[in-house]
Design a protein with these regions (language model features):
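Short, flexible active-site-proximal loops enriched in glycine and acidic residues
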Residues: 19-21, 25
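Conserved beta-strand positions that form and line the central face of beta-propeller blades
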Residues: 39, 78, 88
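C-terminal beta-sandwich interaction modules and adjacent acidic
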Residues: 73-74
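An alpha-helical repeat/solenoid feature that recognizes helix-turn-helix modules
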Residues: 1-19, 42-70, 85, 90-125, ...
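Buried hydrophobic core positions in alpha-solenoid tandem helical repeats
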Residues: 26-31, 37, 79-80, 126-130
């Protein structure tokens, strides 16, 4: 799935209008990769599923402007079940909160148009978790070193949670 996402992005960056893309085939493939809990597998061969593939699926549907082939309600439920007591999101329900998976979760919710449906308490908990990641830069989870990668993910989260800061 990530290869499809990457290729679509390259086409778009190259100025392609995606008119040559077999949208129906891509969307059918996504539908076949969605599991009954709303998550997505990377491929039929790689049975693992986590928030990265939920993000990729939402992004592919956004790029193709078509969410009809997937169960967006189940997808949203899966994302929300992955929120931890800390307010951030794990790769899957019950897993540790992580900067990258939190970005994938909130970005997917934004693409689904479901971010506005989060209550303020949920947003506040996530905002607090993000602010606790700051030392000299951001880390991706408690008791970890600051890292350029996580500084990017947490920085992007701030833009998702506070869109008025889009030019920071």
């Amino acid at each position: 799935m990530e290869k499809i996402w990457s290729n679509l992005k390259v086409y778009i960056f190259s100025g392609d209008d995606l008119s040559r893309i077999n949208r129906k085939s891509i969307l059918q493939g996504l539908k076949n990769l969605q599991k009954s809990d709303g998550s997505f597998m990377a491929s039929k061969e790689e049975q693992g599923c986590d928030m990265r593939f939920v993000y990729c699926a939402a992004s592919i549907c956004t790029l193709l402007d078509d969410f009809e082939g997937i169960d967006t309600e189940k997808m949203t439920e899966y994302i929300l079940k992955s929120q931890t007591y800390e307010g951030a999101f794990g790769q899957s329900p019950g897993l540790e909160a992580h900067g990258g998976s939190t970005y994938c979760a909130l970005a997917a919710l934004a693409m689904l148009g479901s971010l506005e449906n989060l209550n303020q308490h949920v947003k506040d908990r996530c905002q607090k978790w993000c602010s606790l990641r700051l030392n000299e830069a951001f880390n991706g989870r408690p008791n970890k070193q600051d890292d350029t990668c996580y500084t990017y993910w947490i920085g992007k989260l701030i833009l998702i949670l506070f869109p008025s800061y889009k030019y920071l």
